[in-house]
Amino acid sequence: MTAKIIDGKVIAADLRARVADEVARVKREHNLVPGLAVVLVGNDPASEVYVRSKGTQTQAAGMASFEHKLPADVSQADLLAVVAKLNRDPAVHGILVQLPLPKGLNTEAVINAIDPAKDVDGLHPNNAGRLAGGFEALSPCTPLGSIILTKSVHPSLEGLNAIVIGRSNLVGRPLVQLLLNENATVTIAHSRSRDLPGLVKRADLVYAAVGKPEMVRGDWLKPGATVIDIGISRIPKEDGKTRLVGDVAYQEALGVAGAITPVPGGVGQMTVACLLVNTLRAACAIAGLPKPAV
């Protein structure tokens, strides 16, 4: 058996196209142009590339894109002032502060300062709490993308056994809540979990989000399981160069899993696409319009 490859590039492109169609509709019917503001502190090269990608994809979807670049030595007060200004700006419906922030800045205070209605990263305590309570909320983009990828294989997750390996606030915890909302039966595992291979072996759905290269081995998997690899790490190759890998030993898993996301080309493709979804949903909610069809 060779696993089906879940192509994140194709699924993300389809999602972006559907977002663009909905953006055009709300613009035509309601004169509403969703706007996304991204705040970048410092000049980390990887973050700059990511922010540029967000801006390009935002504009390609027909949305307004606003970028605010601040120096690495910006004060906490000045950063919070930028967030407050964006909270008040009626042209901005989504605010994303690129993380991680430089040392000396209080990340929690910055996240808490974002208007929950514009919190398209889904990290504000109001949104995290609503998600945990099973209420409508803006959800973090990577978990949301992971669910969409899973549903490309299993349109209904009801009754399926899922394991989430990793308990971060950004991925693991919100992913558990999204799975519960889909009526899956969820186990959350972490570095202190006993018999992790045994826990994984029972799961129909495996989500690996620990940031440990190729930690999940092929013989851990239940035959036919769907594997969503959320981790990404760069490891050395024999020729002295490096390569990107996920948290799952991909070649081993191919012969056991029923379906699997590659790294790269899987979950990472979905993150920005889901950011566009959240921005569109936020814009419609703020304007008092029905939830868009994405």
Swiss-Prot record:
One of its GO terms (molecular function) is methylenetetrahydrofolate dehydrogenase (NADP+) activity. Pfam families: THF_DHG_CYH, THF_DHG_CYH_C. GO terms for cellular component: cytosol. It catalyses: (6R)-5,10-methylene-5,6,7,8-tetrahydrofolate + NADP(+) = (6R)-5,10-methenyltetrahydrofolate + NADPH; (6R)-5,10-methenyltetrahydrofolate + H2O = (6R)-10-formyltetrahydrofolate + H(+). Pathway: One-carbon metabolism; tetrahydrofolate interconversion. Homodimer. NCBIfam families: PRK14188.1 (NF010785). The keyword Heme does not apply. Its EC number is 1.5.1.5, 3.5.4.9. GO terms for biological process: L-histidine biosynthetic process; methionine biosynthetic process; purine nucleotide biosynthetic process; tetrahydrofolate interconversion. NADP(+) binds at residues 166-168, 191, 232. Catalyzes the oxidation of 5,10-methylenetetrahydrofolate to 5,10-methenyltetrahydrofolate and then the hydrolysis of 5,10-methenyltetrahydrofolate to 10-formyltetrahydrofolate. Belongs to the tetrahydrofolate dehydrogenase/cyclohydrolase family. This is Bifunctional protein FolD. It comes from the Bacteria. Keywords: Amino-acid biosynthesis, Histidine biosynthesis, Hydrolase, Methionine biosynthesis, Multifunctional enzyme, NADP, One-carbon metabolism, Oxidoreductase, Purine biosynthesis.
